[in-house]
From Swiss-Prot:
Magnesium found in the keyword field: yes
Pfam family, one: Pribosyltran
Identification of the protein by name: Orotate phosphoribosyltransferase
Known function: Catalyzes the transfer of a ribosyl phosphate group from 5-phosphoribose 1-diphosphate to orotate, leading to the formation of orotidine monophosphate (OMP).
Signal peptide coordinates: none
Amino acid sequence: MTPEEVLEEFRSAGALLQGHFILSSGLRSPTFLQKMTIFSDPARTERLCRALAEVITARFGRIDIVVSPAIGGIIPGYETARHLGAKAIFVERDPGGPFTLRRGFSIPAGSRAVIVEDIVTTGLSARECLASLKDEAGEVVGAACLIDRSGGRGEIGLPLVSLVTLDIPAYSPDALPPELAAIPPVKPGSRALPKP
């Protein structure tokens, strides 16, 4: 699947939005990728995650376990794991706490794991996911996402592959360009805004 085909999946689903958005990180952006619109369509999700599994295999080889951060990463993680023939597990957090691996999930010795995210903006969720796996016996070999909107600047601590890398601007609320500041902001994501 080419980058343009991936973006067309988002466009045709109405999931590539323009306006003034407050991202989960608290940063502001003129573009928002509403991935849950994508994940509400099983056929579209299957196409994208099959393509992501191919990219993962090409870069990292054999994968035994896909680990995703809850909630946004669970659907693409599961569907990508299905195409990899791997197990799908996830990390979750108590409100305000760190991610933890629960529910009897583990990464046993000798296994190779990859973190699968939906969209990477700063890499925070993937970094927090990786930190929660530090005591696992298996090896976390890399990370993957459908769209890397950081322009390749997301800091994860692992090699990152994606179907598309975009350089979508994100601004601090106190450094907005005038054209963005003129539009009332909306908060479409799921994570609570950071406390000032």
